[in-house]
Amino acid sequence: MLKKKWMVGLLAGCLAAGGFSYNAFATENNENRQASSKTDALTEQEAEAIAKTVVDGTVEDIDRDLYNGKEVYEVEIEKEGEDYDVYVDIHTKQALNDPLKEKAEQVAITKEEAEEIALKQTGGTVTESKLDEDDGAYIYEMEIQTKQGTETEFEISAKDGRIIKQEIDD
């Protein structure tokens, strides 16, 4: 009987020691993994350099963001008067998109053609006009000062010339 109690005590002690050892190893391993992922993480400067290989222009802003469920740096680059967003994966250090290629595939009408479409709807003078990308779709945003003195804002699809929005301001 004394031998059984001694064995149960020894077994309980071994299990407790093993549990403590496993917990210490798991904590240390997790700390090492976190430290290595921090040293492997992409810096803003690296993200900027990678993004500029996709769109060569002036970097205006860099923010951490999510893109298609991945942690990225969103690098906003201005080139020839237009803004482009390049998404660089923080872990793989790869550019995930090519906005110049996307634009070429999606922009079928010129800014002048979009302005003509808007001017047919309301006469006047175009006071502001620019191509903008919104959630992967390219649109022309413009403002027209009418002959009656009101301002009309338009959003026109760059792919097919469809009027997406027309708003009259008093």
Swiss-Prot record:
Outcome of gene disruption: Cells lacking this gene show no noteworthy improvement of beta-toxoid secretion.
Alphabetical list of Gene3D superfamilies matching this protein: 3.10.450.40
Membrane keyword on record: no
Record's note on what induces expression: Up-regulated under secretion stress conditions in a CssR/CssS-dependent manner.
InterPro entries in UniProt: PepSY (IPR025711)
UniProt-listed Pfam families: PepSY
Signal peptide: 1-26
Keywords on record: Signal
Miscellaneous notes: Overexpression of ykoJ is lethal to B.subtilis.
UniProt name for this protein: Uncharacterized protein YkoJ
Organism (species): Bacillus subtilis (strain 168)
